[in-house]
A protein has these predicted regions:
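An N-terminal alpha-helical hairpin/helix-loop-helix interaction module that forms a charged
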Residues: 1-123, 138-173
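Contiguous, well-ordered alpha-helical segments that form the cores/surfaces of helical PPI scaffolds
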Residues: 130-137
Length: 175
């Protein structure tokens, strides 16, 4: 549980300051959602090209120093188009448990890395990137999972749950 009074106070403050403080720093995320929504077509004949366009405005959401999930999933889509298409179809299947879908996406990325990685050390398809893909497709239902932010909010709200690295499924239940 968490302190509901702190939650309400934080929410009021966030809403009060949103336009002046938050929106300038957050607008690009919603532009990325719009770009994704406009370009996403899982049945595209040029799936890799479509994926490139759909993810083109994600910027630091799917790329940072030594972390390249967008570039890697696009590279996999160029090499193994039907496998990556199937990964996204399963990820976006709302009839299945979200934690199972995320785990399956990671495992399939592992297999792609083994087969097509050409010595790459990792595929970068972890909870943060996968939750970003979910959020881009269903922004009213999902948001980007970032353990450091989850912990910060948990601390601010005086939550009694301890969020741990690698315990994504448990963390998701308690968010």
């Amino acid at each position: 549980m968490f302190d509901k009074f702190k939650w309400k106070a934080a929410l009021v403050e966030y809403k009060k300051c949103f336009v002046q403080t938050q929106w300038p720093d957050e607008k690009y995320k919603w532009e990325a959602v719009k770009c994704f929504q406009v370009n996403w077509n899982v049945n595209s004949d040029d799936f890799a090209g479509m994926l490139t366009k759909a993810l083109s405005q994600t910027g630091n959401l799917l790329a940072s120093v030594n972390h390249f999930p967008a570039r890697m999933i696009i590279k996999f889509a160029e090499i193994a188009v039907e496998e990556v298409r199937a990964m996204f179809m399963e990820l976006y299947d709302e009839d299945k448990d979200v934690c199972e879908r995320i785990e399956s996406f990671k495992q399939k990325a592992n297999r792609l890395l083994e087969r097509y990685g050409n010595g790459a050390g990792q595929h970068y398809q972890y909870e943060n990137a996968i939750s970003t893909y979910l959020w881009l497709r269903y922004p009213d239902k999902y948001y980007i999972y970032k353990l450091s932010e989850v912990k910060a909010v948990s601390d601010k709200l005086k939550s009694d749950y301890i969020f741990k690295k690698g315990a994504y499924a448990l963390s998701l239940i308690h968010i």
